[in-house]
Amino acid sequence: MLFWHTQPEHYNQHNSGSYLRDVLALPIFKQEEPQLSPENGARLPPLQYVLCAATSPAVKLHEETLTYLNQGQSYEIRLLENRKLGDFQDLNTKYVKSIIRVVFHDRRLQYTEYQQLEGWRWSRPGDRILDIDIPLSVGILDPRASPTQLNAVEFLWDPSKRASAFIQVHCISTEFTPRKHGGEKGVPFRVQIDTFKQNESGDYSEHLHSASCQIKVFKPKGADRKQKTDREKMEKRTAQEKEKYQPSYETTILTECSPWPDVPYQANNTPSPSYNGSPNSFGLREGNSSPNHPVEPLPLGSDHLLPSASIQDAQQWLHRNRFSQFCWLFASFSGADLLKMSRDDLVQVCGPADGIRLFNAIKGRNVRPKMTIYVCQELEQNQLPLPQKQDDSGDNSLCVYHAIFLEELTTLELTEKIASLYSIPPQHIHRVYRQGPAGIHVVVSNEMVQNFQDESCFILSTLKAESNDGYHIILKCGL
């Protein structure tokens, strides 16, 4: 049976499983004790989260605790308020919103989080990384899980009342190891909780508190076996060696941390409990790793990134070129900083596909067209000329060629490119012919366009169409 105090207070772990009201001088908390002790007048964190799962005994002193979880098993997270309501002056709303995430602990995997989660999505269609067990949870309102953000859930709760959320983690740590030959050590995850209160507009976007802990997830019953193995190893150590390790505690206290980078500070529209909002609305960012900043629609463009670009200019350039998911990674990078990054650097940070694409975009590398041809207009007395396309010098005596870049290699594309070059409607060009042997006119088909030699030169000759409202274009071989 779970024991709950009538008044939420600051709880701490004890290796017997009970909760003490005073801060214990545990080795892992020695560095934090002065700032958490209420006697010295320091600020207590407004909230505290306790994961009801035992910590590993094989963790050295002054290292972060590690907790083993079983895949798919429901674990309770107790949501506690540290201060009495009379002292809770910075909480001006009855409800707060918490977002629980399962994220990578390793920095290397954080850089490629989007690619890692997308790969997991494709290998496990229809599954989620994190779920909330609603029937077991107590005191939470409006629980939601985005269909596109598989590793996060959110809900509302009242800090003055008993509240606990039961979570289930469905991915295991070895699913993200680079080599899978058996016996690999799984990568550690983090359970992070970010809590927000309402702002003046009623949105839950004002950050209140964040905390996290380190976990590893095993196949069903694997966490129990691992915990037993660690305990047996510690029992074999000498008393002197045991002093270098933390004792195992039956619960895990999440330690304060910075908010997750993609926290929706301004762009959150989750309704309050009294608001009848859309059931499909969801306050989380629709992507998996990038921040959701309020950005105005930006025009599409292939502009080059300049070394003189400021940090803000670099962020806007990333948005314009479809790299929004990496804006949080490059939040402090100027244009010069990005230009100094090598291809290998960007691949390591963004993953192979996006890293190469970002490198090409930064270096201004354009996609080479499938075919390039050069055209020049021929003027004769008995022809209806197209509007003149003059060169920069304005000298009409020169036969100036213009490049036409073809991608689809079709007659329609060729017609549209010629019409665009001479600023006439495409429907005014009725037919396109190529002058063949003995001056015959051959209809230009898709197959003929596909067999043009790259960088061929043509002189455009025009004939008046029979309907008197357009032209026929004749392609003559140029020099």
From Swiss-Prot:
Renumbered residue ranges of the record's region SAM2-like domain: 261-365
Q: Please list the GO biological process terms of this entry.
A: cell morphogenesis; cytoplasm organization; determination of adult lifespan; epithelial cell maturation; negative regulation of transcription by RNA polymerase II; positive regulation of growth; salivary gland development
Q: Which residues form the Grh/CP2 DB domain?
A: 43-280
Instruction: Tell me where it resides.
Output: Nucleus
Report keywords, A-Z: DNA-binding, Nucleus, Transcription, Transcription regulation
Fetch the Gene3D superfamilies from UniProt: Transcription Factor, Ets-1 (1.10.150.50)
Q: Which InterPro entries match?
A: CP2, SAM/pointed_sf, SAM_3, TF_CP2-like, TFCP2L1_SAM
Q: Recall the GO molecular function terms of this protein's record.
A: DNA-binding transcription repressor activity, RNA polymerase II-specific; RNA polymerase II cis-regulatory region sequence-specific DNA binding; RNA polymerase II transcription regulatory region sequence-specific DNA binding
Q: Where are the annotated segments for Mediate transcriptional repression? A: 1-52
Compositional bias annotation for Polar residues: 266-292
Residue ranges with Basic and acidic residues bias: 221-245
Chain positions covered by the region annotation Disordered? 219-248, 260-301
Complex formation: Forms homohexamers via its SAM-like domain. Interacts with Mta1; which is indispensable for Tfcp2l1-mediated self-renewal-promoting effect and endoderm-inhibiting action.
Q: Per its UniProt record, what PANTHER family does this chain match?
A: TRANSCRIPTION FACTOR CP2 (PTHR11037), TRANSCRIPTION FACTOR CP2-LIKE PROTEIN 1 (PTHR11037:SF18)
Entry note about domains: The Grh/CP2 DB domain is required for direct DNA-binding. The Grh/CP2 DB domain is essential to maintain the undifferentiated state of embryonic stem cells.
Q: What does this protein do?
A: Transcription factor that facilitates establishment and maintenance of pluripotency in embryonic stem cells (ESCs). With Klf2, acts as the major effector of self-renewal that mediates induction of pluripotency downstream of LIF/Stat3 and Wnt/beta-catenin signaling. Required for normal duct development in the salivary gland and kidney. Coordinates the development of the kidney collecting ducts intercalated (IC) and principal (PC) cells, which regulate acid-base and salt-water homeostasis, respectively.
Q: What is this protein called?
A: Transcription factor CP2-like protein 1
Organism, scientific name:
Mus musculus
